[in-house]
Amino acid sequence: MSKTLSFKTYSAKPAEVERKWYVIDAEDQILGRMAAEIAKVLRGKHKPQFTPHIDTGDFIVVTNAEKVALSGKKIEYKTYFHHSNYPGGGKFDHVKDLLKKKPEKVIEHAVWGMLPHNNLGRQLFKKLKVYAGSEHPHTAQCPVELKVN
């Protein structure tokens, strides 16, 4: 009297995904470690319903972006390269200057590098909200604080 077991692989459906809102305080957090955790939550890998080709992730609000920490001497030596697509249009920005002018860009750049670079990755990236100060306009969504080690 043995039963035949039938194991089916679960595939999440976009309409069934329940999304939560999380807030992360970036003050004194190591940039790379925090970005890896953010990418994991945006992708939905922390959920048992994770499906690689479906957006199963949650929303992330990052505050205090200007107070993020970088390990080692990266604050002095790390640079970001971008190009205007004109001849001689290559530019280098130091992370120290970028943290003063646009601190949100530092976190966004780190997280974008850890997401897939396709349509799904662009959809996931839209769920990341980064703010320089401690205030954010998403209090109506009742975000839960997420601790990052």
Swiss-Prot record:
Keywords: Ribonucleoprotein, Ribosomal protein. Gene3D superfamilies: Ribosomal protein L13 (3.90.1180.10). It comes from the Bacteria. GO terms for molecular function: mRNA binding; structural constituent of ribosome. GO terms for biological process: negative regulation of translation; translation. Belongs to the universal ribosomal protein uL13 family. This is Large ribosomal subunit protein uL13. The gene is rplM.
